[in-house]
Amino acid sequence: GRSWEATSRALMTLLSLGDVLDLASGDGVFAGLIAPHARSVTCVDISGAVINAARKRLSDIGNVSFHEGDMHQLPFPPASFDHVFAMHALSFSTDAANLLTEAHRLLRPGGRLVLAVLRKHSHEETMRAFDHVNLGFEEAELQALLRGSGFVAQECSVTSRESRPPYFEVITAMARREKT
């Protein structure tokens, strides 16, 4: 919804995104926003129906490709992407550490990970309604996961607070793979 859109619009200031991986890409709205700023965008989602909806939505954009599969174990060679976006992908991750390690593997040296995720909450009914598999994360927890996956965390903070119940907060994090 509006949280990832606000974050993505702020990130539009990044020039020349290069080759982009969009994890848990959903129906392709985010990919459509960043495609004009990228050499290529690869959308990954576990749902074939969602991938088909994204393919239909973005059929007129030539630099976007689609992959149905598990974001925790992707078939791409190491160092394939300049940027990995995980806009609420962690909400659907059964193993956040593994997902971040996979993102690190797929980034080129100096590449950047940008993620957004709900801050820790207690709304289990919402979690179930949206097929989330966890109740979010705290900033310190995310920073530790990023470091443990080999990233240098550059930013990790609450960037959005909803003004009505259940008052969800969104954490946005940016991290970089070392240039070595």
Regions found by a protein language model. Give the residues of each.
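Short alpha-helix
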Residues: 134-149
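A short glycine-rich, Lys/Arg-flanked "PGG" loop and its adjoining helix->strand segment in the class I
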Residues: 97-112
